[in-house]
């Protein structure tokens, strides 16, 4: 699918911009992000979140979990673009309360909800439940696999947003994946529109 086919329509762009406005405003009272100027945030938060759309759209239909959602990236942009039932999980109550407020303000609280707590506890409450899990700059690939695998349904995908992809880390993650009943699907590196920020999208699937 081409970049044009992944581009937001007018309504989606309005919601993406509104979300970013809400984040910048809320950041004055709640520490959500260190990136607060509009242009940088558009690239490093919004564009970065949407960069995973090709991989996200290959996932099976079904509920979506964003681990360590923070300010709602990539969870809210991906919910806006895909319309998936979305759960934004974070261990910090101030952040999940802000995310609830964002979803209500954006009018997407019919598909977006939050979970305040540890991912390990969520996996006990909703095992094998999610068709898609995302994690953005959160932890090592091996750690993400260990957290996500109990939550994923058979055939479900873990889409990892990384600042870079090191072959040694990926090889170790592939070994861990096999032990967890997961398998490596793909790795794609790219540069954001600022011309200097490198990113990688790495995907695993539950067998």
List the model feature ranges, each with a label.
Residues 1-65, 94-97, 101-110:
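Class I SAM-dependent transferase core
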Residues 25, 80-81, 153:
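Residues at the C-terminal ends
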Residues 60-61, 83, 181:
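Residue-level detector of structured alpha->beta connecting loops
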Residues 71-83:
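Conserved SAM-binding loop of SAM-dependent methyltransferases across substrates and taxa
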């Amino acid at each position: 699918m081409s970049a044009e086919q992944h581009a937001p329509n007018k309504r989606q762009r309005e919601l993406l911009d509104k979300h970013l406005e809400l984040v910048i405003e809320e950041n004055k009272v709640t520490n959500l992000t260190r990136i607060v100027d509009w242009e940088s945030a558009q690239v490093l938060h919004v564009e970065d979140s949407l960069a995973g759309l090709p991989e996200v759209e290959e996932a099976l239909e079904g509920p979506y979990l964003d681990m360590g959602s923070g300010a709602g990236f990539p969870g809210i942009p991906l919910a806006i673009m895909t319309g998936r039932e979305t759960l934004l999980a974070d261990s910090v109550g101030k952040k999940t309360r802000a995310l609830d407020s964002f979803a209500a303000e954006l009018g997407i609280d019919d598909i977006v909800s939050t979970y305040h707590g540890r991912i390990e506890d969520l996996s006990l409450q909703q095992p094998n439940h999610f068709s898609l899990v995302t994690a953005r700059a959160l932890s090592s690939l091996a750690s993400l696999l260990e957290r996500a695998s109990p939550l994923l349904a058979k055939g479900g995908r873990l889409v990892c947003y990384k600042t870079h992809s090191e072959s040694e880390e990926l090889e170790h993650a592939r070994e861990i994946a096999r032990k967890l009943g997961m398998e490596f699907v793909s790795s794609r590196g790219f540069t954001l529109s600022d011309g200097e920020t490198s990113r990688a999208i790495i995907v695993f699937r539950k067998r």
